[in-house]
Amino acid sequence: MAAAVRQDLAQLMNSSGSHKDLAGKYRQILEKAIQLSGTEQLEALKAFVEAMVNENVSLVISRQLLTDFCTHLPNLPDSTAKEVYHFTLEKIQPRVISFEEQVASIRQHLASIYEKEEDWRNAAQVLVGIPLETGQKQYNVDYKLETYLKIARLYLEDDDPVQAEAYINRASLLQNESTNEQLQIHYKVCYARVLDYRRKFIEAAQRYNELSYKTIVHESERLEALKHALHCTILASAGQQRSRMLATLFKDERCQQLAAYGILEKMYLDRIIRGNQLQEFAAMLMPHQKATTADGSSILDRAVIEHNLLSASKLYNNITFEELGALLEIPAAKAEKIASQMITEGRMNGFIDQIDGIVHFETREALPTWDKQIQSLCFQVNNLLEKISQTAPEWTAQAMEAQMAQ
């Protein structure tokens, strides 16, 4: 049957007639090829593609028929469709400028097949082949933005944040021109994930937190975004930015539903965190967040050591490296190095006396510390009152009435 299709195509290519008549006859041959199965179908479709890219066929007809051809292929088995897509791209390549729209459609469908197979890199590379900026066809902003975001997401799935960042940067140039709110959300999600993968944790936390307030996003996804914001904040380097983010999250009552709330509370209240308290939280982290730093410690270990060092600076006026190392559960030399780095980067106030082996912390103002402690106490009292009202609403109502009557 494939031979019959090839013969019909050869005869039609040498015949004359109006574009409408010829297009109708080619369409009948395409329908016949689609009806076949297995190897016969594959060979017939390849013959059809060869005919369409032949220069003897009018460009008006071949574009129209290749568009129809593209609408049929998603209904075929993925293995057949994939082979036909690759064959078509290869045959079209010498005349790719004439078939830009059809090539874009083919690449989108082929990428979808690779995505179903979880072959993320090939899916991304197929989409990269669409000439969004360099081709003759003018693509609309939403199409370009959606494609760039999809490429970035696929590279993230393939654990390649460098390539993902390159395409999210291209998307960032377009996102202000788009009025599609759903695409804007996809952009923010993808950008937050790129920052997360690139270990820019505090920036990622800010993006995730912003997403957690978007009403267009489903409630469960908003809570998921809040969870990511919390995890990234915990993993971020200690300093003013992180302290502000900890305060923002601690005041957000939704965080009390999250498994990592206990760690958030300890960090916000400047309490020392021990290694054995982190096991449950460490298990929640994504693979890229479990990576090790240059000194061999994990990202989480480093973040907690820096947090504990800041907490120690609020407990002590000065401390020897040996005592500091024991407090942080690390060697004294490592404690000195981290303290030195944090002071140099302006993330902690103090100075180091290397002769005596002591780190001196600059005294903090008492008033802001008292304010923070009072704020924390009020927050805890509010939580208790809410729990009492949930458990005994009638008693709470009576108590409130009695209070108002006084």
From Swiss-Prot:
Q: Which PROSITE patterns match?
A: PCI
Which Pfam families does this entry report, sorted A to Z? Answer: CSN4_RPN5_eIF3a, PCI, PSMD12-CSN4_N
Q: Does the keyword Nucleus apply?
A: yes
GO biological process assignments: protein deneddylation
Q: Which residues carry this modification: N-acetylalanine?
A: A2
Key words, A-Z = Acetylation, Cytoplasm, Cytoplasmic vesicle, Nucleus, Signalosome, Synapse
Keyword Cytoplasm attached: yes
User: Cellular location of this protein?
Assistant: Cytoplasm; Nucleus; Cytoplasmic vesicle, Secretory vesicle, Synaptic vesicle
Using the record's annotation, list all stretches that form the PCI domain.
197-366
The free-text function statement in the UniProt record for this protein reads:
Component of the COP9 signalosome complex (CSN), a complex involved in various cellular and developmental processes. The CSN complex is an essential regulator of the ubiquitin (Ubl) conjugation pathway by mediating the deneddylation of the cullin subunits of SCF-type E3 ligase complexes, leading to decrease the Ubl ligase activity of SCF-type complexes such as SCF, CSA or DDB2. Also involved in the deneddylation of non-cullin subunits such as STON2.
On subunit structure and binding partners, the annotation says: Component of the CSN complex, composed of COPS1/GPS1, COPS2, COPS3, COPS4, COPS5, COPS6, COPS7 (COPS7A or COPS7B), COPS8 and COPS9. In the complex, it probably interacts directly with COPS1, COPS2, COPS3, COPS5, COPS6, COPS7 (COPS7A or COPS7B) and COPS8. Interacts with TOR1A; the interaction is direct and associates TOR1A and SNAPIN with the CSN complex. Interacts with STON2; controls STON2 neddylation levels. Interacts with ERCC6.
Q: Which PANTHER family match?
A: 26S PROTEASOME NON-ATPASE REGULATORY SUBUNIT 12/COP9 SIGNALOSOME COMPLEX SUBUNIT 4, COP9 SIGNALOSOME COMPLEX SUBUNIT 4
The protein's name is: COP9 signalosome complex subunit 4
